């Protein structure tokens, strides 16, 4: 929690490794399934280097494309945007931390910048990094992205 400061509410993906991080804030954790990682379907567990080039091309060129049994980036954005909107309603009243995964955080980034999901292919997000989205008088403002300074030597 020291990399972020005091928080009023902690929201987390239901996956165990993320919940463990969320619990480190010492606050009750609200589990919200909308913050779970993108469903990679038939590609789940496949090393990035083993994914065929044609698959990458299809994925990058069509935000509606999804691996068999999985979820598209468009679907992910449709899932994450309402969660962002709900959290923005408590801005100014509560400081909220969301502990999630790379893809949903990138979807939240797209929401905050008012751009489409194509941004997911144009930014890198490190595991354990901190991204800060503040809600100002005119809506969401990206205040920090992919900060890993708190990880020190562990990075």
Q: Where do the language-model regions lie?
A:
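Amphipathic, non-transmembrane alpha-helical scaffold segments
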Residues: 15, 73, 77-81
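Alpha-helix N-cap/helix-start capping motif
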Residues: 15-19, 102-103, 127
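Active-site signature of alpha/beta-hydrolase-fold catalytic machinery across serine-
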Residues: 24, 107-111
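Acidic, low-complexity terminal tails and accessory targeting/binding regions
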Residues: 31, 38-50, 89-94, 111-155
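Short glycine/proline- and acidic residue-enriched helix-loop micro-motifs
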Residues: 55-75
């Amino acid at each position: 929690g020291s990399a972020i400061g005091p928080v009023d509410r902690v929201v987390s993906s239901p996956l165990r490794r993320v919940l463990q991080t969320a619990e480190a804030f010492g606050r009750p954790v609200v589990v919200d399934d909308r913050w779970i990682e993108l469903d990679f379907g038939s590609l789940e567990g496949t090393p990035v280097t083993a994914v065929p080039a044609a698959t990458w091309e299809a994925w990058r060129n069509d935000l509606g494309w999804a691996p068999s049994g999985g979820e598209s980036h468009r679907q992910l954005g449709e899932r994450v945007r309402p969660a962002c909107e709900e959290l923005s309603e408590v801005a100014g009243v509560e400081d909220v931390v969301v502990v999630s995964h790379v893809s949903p955080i990138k979807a939240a980034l797209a929401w905050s910048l008012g751009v489409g999901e194509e941004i997911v292919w144009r930014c890198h997000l490190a595991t354990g990094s901190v991204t800060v989205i503040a809600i100002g008088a005119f809506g969401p403002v990206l205040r920090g992205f992919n900060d890993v300074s708190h990880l020190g030597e562990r990075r």
